């Protein structure tokens, strides 16, 4: 049997109990990842959730706003989806859905923001 290691990231779920640990980018296993994408998601609007997360090469986490009222309040989430790029625990950029509740950002825009954050952190 041939096994091929996967270097990509999978979409995970977070809630009020672990969101801060995830956003900080610190791993218990010593594999720190400073950039993290968090999507504040709502079941009623699943059709408009960001669907290309498998194409992003950094951790991608969803937070169910119905189950995470503290995180929703702290990050001022009013609409879902709201997507935030964090860099070492700090908000780098936020994309918020409008009244149409459509996903507010494209894969290309997220990739560009990640590239800019990576370049800025090199200095």
Predicted regions and their residues:
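N-terminal signal peptide c-region/cleavage motif recognized by signal peptidases
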Residues: 3-5
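Boundary of Sec targeting at the N-terminus
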Residues: 9-11
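Local sequence-structure signature of Cys/Sec-based thiol-disulfide redox active-site neighborhoods
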Residues: 13-57
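Short amphipathic alpha-helix with an adjacent loop that forms part of the alpha/beta core around
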Residues: 26, 74-75
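Thiol-based oxidoreductase modules, predominantly thioredoxin-like and allied folds used
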Residues: 39-44, 56-70, 77
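Extracytoplasmic/secreted cell-surface and envelope-processing proteins
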Residues: 46-49, 71, 93-95
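Structural micro-motif
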Residues: 75-87
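Non-catalytic, surface beta->alpha helical segment in thiol-disulfide oxidoreductase systems
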Residues: 85-123
């Amino acid at each position: 049997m041939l096994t091929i290691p996967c270097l990509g990231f999978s979409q995970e779920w977070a809630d009020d109990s672990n969101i801060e640990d995830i956003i900080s980018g610190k791993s218990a296993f010593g594999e720190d990842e400073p950039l993290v994408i968090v999507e504040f998601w709502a079941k009623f609007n699943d059709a408009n959730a960001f669907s290309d997360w498998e194409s992003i090469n950094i951790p991608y986490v969803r937070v169910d706003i119905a189950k995470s009222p503290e995180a929703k309040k702290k990050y001022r989430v009013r609409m879902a989806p709201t997507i935030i790029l964090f860099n070492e625990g700090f908000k780098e950029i936020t994309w918020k859905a409008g009244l149409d509740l459509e996903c507010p950002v494209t894969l290309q825009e997220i990739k560009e923001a990640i590239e800019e954050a990576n370049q800025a952190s090199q200095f």
